[in-house]
Amino acid sequence: MQGLDERLAAVAAFVPLGARLADIGADHAKLPLALAAKGKIARAIAVDVNEGPFEAARRAVRAAGMAQLVEVRLGDGLAALAPGEVDAVAVAGMGGSSITRILADGAAVLQAVETLVLQPQGDAAELRAWLYDNGWHIAEESLVRAGGRLYEVLLARRGKKEKPEPVLLAIGPCLWQEKPPLLKKHIEGLIFRVRRARAGMEKSARARDGAAYRALGEKIAALEEKLIW
């Protein structure tokens, strides 16, 4: 989509047509402005907790002449919204733990939301587990390469489904089912990060004898099994 890099274009692709969108973490309001310019959304509220990005987003919206379609608010996550204002939420470019906290803290607002579009920077397994534990499921996922990095984008919809096994929470259940071209690179990256964490424990005999060290070894083995299909 014009004006968006590959990462944000992948996020935009999952936003439902005609959505009333909240974009948490404004980033100059790039995502809602691009969607509004294409007529893809009914309206949007861009939220940022920091004054600098908030002001930058306000300037971008004014410059684009989109103030009637895109509102910018200063606030912490979903706390800047009233229940019923939006039916879709996008959170991109934050750690999975931070996204999980934003969603957990915004339970009242999420009651009226049907779609979540999430792009976690790490800790995606924790985020996926939270979604399945809290009445959501992963409907679609994509992998995109941008700036030499791989990014995961998740589309979650309301509705409880069976929670995938831990290794698929790490990889992505839809990614595993669809096996896109970048999947092996994605799994190899996960293995590298787990190995690095385990290597950091090897200098301590107590750590090597602990349950956490063994659990990381089991996680590596489970991921390596998924490299063969």
PLM feature spans:
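Conserved class I S-adenosyl-L-methionine
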Residues: 18-27
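An accessory alpha-helical subdomain
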Residues: 167-229
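S-adenosyl-L-methionine
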Residues: 1-18, 33, 55-84
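Conserved SAM-binding motif I beta-strand of class I
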Residues: 43-48
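C-terminal substrate-binding/active-site "lid" region of AdoMet-derived donor-dependent transferases
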Residues: 105-155
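Conserved SAM/SAH-binding beta-strand->alpha-helix loop
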Residues: 50-52
